[in-house]
From Swiss-Prot:
Lineage, opening ranks: Bacteria, Pseudomonadati, Pseudomonadota, Acidithiobacillia, Acidithiobacillales
One GO location term (cellular component): cytosol
InterPro entries named among the record's database cross-references: DUF520, UPF0234-like_C, UPF0234_N, YajQ-like_sf
Keyword Nucleotide-binding: yes
Molecular function GO labels: nucleotide binding
Record flagged with keyword Aminoacyl-tRNA synthetase: no
Keywords attached to this entry: Nucleotide-binding
UniProt xrefs under CDD domains: YajQ_like
NCBIfam families assigned: PRK05412.1 (NF003819)
HAMAP family: YajQ (MF_00632)
Protein family: Belongs to the YajQ family.
Name this protein carries in UniProt: Nucleotide-binding protein AFE_0977
Cited function: Nucleotide-binding protein.
Length: 161
């Protein structure tokens, strides 16, 4: 029985590369001259620190442009609220969404059932396995899942016949 896996992954190396080029650009930009703005990644979070919200917004714009250039989907980025940090600075945390949550997997299974596809979905940890009777049915399911917005980037792996 043919099957494939639906996953949501982010290439952390590309995120690091985008982060480093953004930091390099911030150090050379005129509007950040003399600023103590900083940006760092800790596991699945990117922490931005700057003097005011305007600079935080500029940093997010620069980072998102670099991420898009590197092929990282911006749906994987969840922007947190601005909070006060030490020394009169502002802090903002960007979370990277990695893996399918159970709720999103259930929505995908419901989407496949409502679409009358001859494919069944089963949740396996942070991924979804979809199996069906024919390859054509699975390819139609992939096309439908790609066309629908679930709020996070989805990739299709492990296609088996």
């Amino acid at each position: 029985m043919p099957s494939f896996d639906v996953v949501s992954e982010v290439d952390m190396q590309e995120v690091d590369n985008a982060l480093h080029t953004t930091v390099k650009e911030i150090t050379t930009r005129y509007d950040f001259k003399g600023s103590k703005a900083s940006m760092e990644r800790k596991e699945k979070e990117i922490i931005l620190v700057a003097e005011d919200e305007y600079k935080l917004g500029q940093m997010i714009d620069l980072l998102s442009a670099r991420l898009v250039k590197r092929g990282v989907d911006l749906k994987a980025l969840e922007v947190g609220k601005v909070a006060a940090a030490a020394g009169g600075m502002e802090r903002q945390v960007l979370s990277l969404k990695v893996g399918l949550e159970t709720e999103v997997s259930k929505r995908m299974i419901k989407f496949l059932k409502d679409g009358k596809f001859k494919a069944q979905g089963s949740i396996q940890g942070d991924q979804l396995r979809v199996s069906g009777k024919s390859r054509d049915e699975l390819q139609a399911a992939i096309a439908a899942l790609r066309g629908h917005d679930f709020g996070l980037p989805v990739q299709f792996t492990n296609f088996r016949d």
